[in-house]
From Swiss-Prot:
Any GO BP annotation: maturation of SSU-rRNA
GO terms for cellular component: cytosol; preribosome, small subunit precursor
Catalytic residue positions: 406 (proton acceptor)
Disulfide bonds: none
Keyword 4Fe-4S: no
Gene3D superfamilies, A to Z: Phosphorylase Kinase, domain 1, Transferase(Phosphotransferase) domain 1
Name recorded for this polypeptide: Serine/threonine-protein kinase RIO3
Modified residues (Phosphoserine): 8, 112, 125, 127-128
Gene this chain is encoded by: RIOK3
Biased composition regions of type Acidic residues, renumbered to the chain: 124-134
Database matches in PROSITE patterns: RIO1
Pfam assignment, any one: RIO1
Function in brief: Involved in regulation of type I interferon (IFN)-dependent immune response which plays a critical role in the innate immune response against DNA and RNA viruses. May act as an adapter protein essential for the recruitment of TBK1 to IRF3. Phosphorylates IFIH1 on 'Ser-828' interfering with IFIH1 filament assembly on long dsRNA and resulting in attenuated IFIH1-signaling. Can inhibit CASP10 isoform 7-mediated activation of the NF-kappaB signaling pathway. May play a role in the biogenesis of the 40S ribosomal subunit. Involved in the processing of 21S pre-rRNA to the mature 18S rRNA.
Catalysis performed (reactions): L-seryl-[protein] + ATP = O-phospho-L-seryl-[protein] + ADP + H(+); L-threonyl-[protein] + ATP = O-phospho-L-threonyl-[protein] + ADP + H(+)
Length: 519
């Protein structure tokens, strides 16, 4: 053995494993490997490992028991296999049900394949879409207690402890339990933990009321969708209000400011009305949107205000209920226009769209002007308000030829030191068959309010009626006064039927007080 290096055998010498054969008959030269080179390579490798150990210290690894095949937990694998098998079985059962349904068809006699199903005994509740809560409800306080049955003989107990089926306590508890059978919309309350007892009379009344409300809600379901009974905003009304905002006429609608029996008033900020005409209306900065309710529940008893009005008499009987409500809005628009021309403080009409009337807002910064009923006035301001009201009533009667017909402290606003009149949808002309009666009622409301307010100069209702109308009815009591008013109305109605409305005008050309009939 050569210590210097290991050399390959010469070409002529045969190797121990046999001569190497080359397919091209060319001998291969074996590269000689020196022992010194091998040792140098090993030394360099050791030095490299030492340097790496110095730069990257070895992290101590906690020694622990090696995981062997005996310690591996295979329960998850078993569960996975069971779940896969359950899915396969469910698919098989579903296919079996389809085959069963196809095999039976529409036959009245069917054959069941249930015995061939692959159902697991531990199949959980997830197999069905409807989850079932298997909690114990034996002690559930919200579960209605099972009533104690009464035997056929009709009583329980003996002697003094006998209890019949007509016992007040037993019947009261049974009636309380029966309230759970009412419709879900009927709120019966929560009686958990309380021993409630209802008498038969009370239970029967509640039962009848619940049934009647259920029938009523079912009957008015569709009508409610098309009415404005609640907040006066149905889908059609919302669409109209949306179009007003979308067109730019209104900038925004802030909210409701007043609610009444016949209408609801909303506050809105005015926009700009783009119109090619030069005389287009200027929209105020703040507007009031009056929406008339489209149900006739509140208008059935108020048709006398519009049925006998000559301006709408011919149109009233030809319209459906919804168009009658539009007529109310149109009537208020015309009345406000008359008052505006006469210079009476009132809202200015901006736009009328079906049963929606847009007017100027009386107030400031979304705060409406207070009513005379709500405002606190001193004696001088109250006296000034009375004289303004008296002047407005005379001006409304003579210059506008109108009677408010619902004038009271609730329909008069106090703003900027003046009295403003609102809500004139029911106002009629004095030629109305009941025009003078409405005027007398207005005088009564105004007189009583200011007399209670401490205005000593306030006239009585009969004196105020004569002062406003210009008539001189001398009657000692109210009954005779009303009788003369009805007689004048009857004579005026006959005169109108014979000679027409123009011949029975209340205003003379010479400015004298109005007359109900020609003398």
């Amino acid at each position: 053995m050569d210590l210097v290096g290991v050399a390959s055998p010469e070409p002529g010498t045969a190797a121990a494993w046999g001569p190497s054969k080359c397919p091209w008959a060319i001998p291969q030269n074996t590269i000689s490997c020196s022992l010194a080179d091998v040792m140098s390579e090993q030394l360099a490798k050791e030095l490299q490992l030492e340097e790496e150990a110095a730069v990257f210290p070895e992290v101590a690894v906690a020694e622990g028991p090696f995981i062997t095949g005996e310690n591996i937990d295979t329960s998850s694998d078993l569960m996975l296999a069971q779940m896969l098998q359950m899915e396969y079985d469910r698919e098989y059962d579903a296919q079996l049900r389809r085959e069963e349904k196809k095999f039976n068809g529409d036959s009245k006699v069917s054959i069941s394949f249930e015995n061939y199903r692959k159902v697991h005994p531990y199949e959980d509740s997830d197999s069905s879409e409807d989850e079932v809560d298997w909690q114990d409800t034996r002690d559930d306080p919200y579960r209605p207690a099972k009533p104690v049955p009464t035997p056929k003989k009709g009583f329980i107990g003996k002697g003094k402890d006998i209890t019949t089926k007509h016992d007040e306590v037993v019947c009261g508890r049974k009636n309380t339990a029966r309230m759970e059978n009412f419709a879900p919309e009927f709120q019966v309350g929560d009686g958990i933990g309380m021993d409630l007892k209802l008498s038969n009379h009370v239970f029967n009344a509640l039962k009848q009321h619940a049934y009647s409300e259920e029938r009523r809600s079912a009957r008015l379901h569709e009508k409610k969708e098309h009415s404005t009974a609640e907040k006066a905003v149905d889908p059609k009304t919302r669409l109209l209000m949306y179009k007003m905002v979308n067109s730019g006429m209104l900038e925004t609608i802030t909210g409701c400011i007043s609610t009444g029996k016949e209408s609801v008033v909303f506050h809105a900020y005015g926009g700009s009305m783009e119109d090619e005409k030069e005389d287009s209306k200027v929209i105020p900065t703040e507007c009031a949107i009056k929406v008339f309710k489209t149900t006739l529940n509140e208008f059935k008893n108020r048709d006398k205000y519009i049925k006998d009005d000559f301006r709408f008499k011919d149109r009233f009987s030809k319209l459906n209920p919804r168009k009658i409500i539009r007529m109310w809005a149109e009537k208020e628009m015309h009345n406000l226009a008359r008052m505006q021309r006469a210079g009476i403080p009132c809202p200015t009409v901006v736009l009328l769209k079906k049963h929606i009337l847009v007017m100027s807002f009386i107030g400031h910064d979304q705060v409406p002007a207070p009513k005379l009923k709500e405002v606190k006035l001193n004696s001088e301001e109250m006296k000034e308000a009375y004289y303004q009201t008296l002047h407005l009533m005379r001006q409304l009667y003579h210059e506008c030829t109108l009677v408010h017909a619902d004038l009271s402290e609730y329909n008069m606003l106090w703003h900027a030191g003046k009295v403003w009149l609102i809500d004139v949808s029911q106002s009629v002309e004095p030629t109305h068959p009941h025009g003078l009666e409405f005027l007398f009622r207005d005088c009564r409301n105004v007189s009583q309010f200011f007399q209670k307010g401490g205005v000593k100069e306030a006239l009585s209702e009969r004196e105020l009626f004569n002062a406003v109308s210009g008539l001189n009815i001398t009657a000692d009591n109210e009954a005779d006064f009303l009788a003369e008013i009805e007689a004048l109305e009857k004579m005026n109605e006959d005169h109108v039927q014979k000679n027409g409305r123009k011949a029975a005008s209340f205003l003379k050309d010479d400015g004298d007080p109005p007359l109900l009939y020609d003398e």
